[in-house]
Curated annotation (Swiss-Prot):
The keyword Transferase does not apply. Could be a nuclease involved in processing of the 5'-end of pre-16S rRNA. PANTHER family: POLYNUCLEOTIDYL TRANSFERASE, RIBONUCLEASE H-LIKE SUPERFAMILY PROTEIN. GO terms for cellular component: cytosol. This is Putative pre-16S rRNA nuclease. One of its GO terms (biological process) is rRNA 5'-end processing. Coiled coil: none annotated. Its EC number is 3.1.-.-. Its main location: cytoplasm. It is found in: Cytoplasm. One of its GO terms (molecular function) is nuclease activity.
Length: 164
């Protein structure tokens, strides 16, 4: 299955199966999971990057334990809407995951400022110290990314006159 746009992705997800969201960074991959109604995203895990094959195995194990049916990967677009080096890296991650599991639907979601937004919430609203923020910010950013994709998927379904 190729990488899909968000509408195709939404159509490819079976009913009552969750999806995961990824916030890939240089050292870690934040992972979030949706509920089965595709309404709410929650932080799930932080994968510390090692070898791609090991990281992918960890991700697929997490997905299997949650019966997740698809992957939303954050795409850190530049503020002017162009794609930089990090976007290329995240797109390569998607292609490489598809090589290992070609049946899993994958889409990308613009994640501009997701980490900054989550960090601001952690500092201003929860007074979380720097050490604790480092432990949770990437998986919370993954939830932020996934929540945005879920809301767009819901909008697509509603515009088509379908329940979600």
């Amino acid at each position: 299955m190729p990488v899909l746009d968000i509408a195709e992705f939404a159509a490819a997800i079976p009913d009552y199966l969750p999806i995961v969201g990824l916030d890939p960074g240089e050292k870690t991959i934040g992972v979030a999971v949706s509920d089965v109604t595709l309404t709410v995203a929650s932080p799930l895990a932080l994968i510390k990057k090692t070898k791609f094959s090991e990281d992918a195995a960890t991700l697929f194990q997490l997905m299997g334990s949650r019966k997740a049916a698809g992957i939303v990967i954050g795409l850190p677009m530049n503020m002017d809407g162009t794609e930089g080096v990090r976007c290329q890296s995240n797109r390569a991650l998607g292609r490489n995951l598809l090589r290992l599991q070609p049946h899993i639907p994958i889409t990308f979601w613009d994640e501009r400022l997701s980490t900054a937004a989550v960090t601001r919430v952690l500092i201003e609203e929860h007074d979380v110290n720097r050490k604790r923020r480092a432990e949770v910010v990437d998986k919370m950013a993954a939830a932020w990314i996934l929540q945005g994709a879920l809301e767009r998927m819901r909008g697509i379904a509603e515009a088509a006159g379908k329940g979600f």
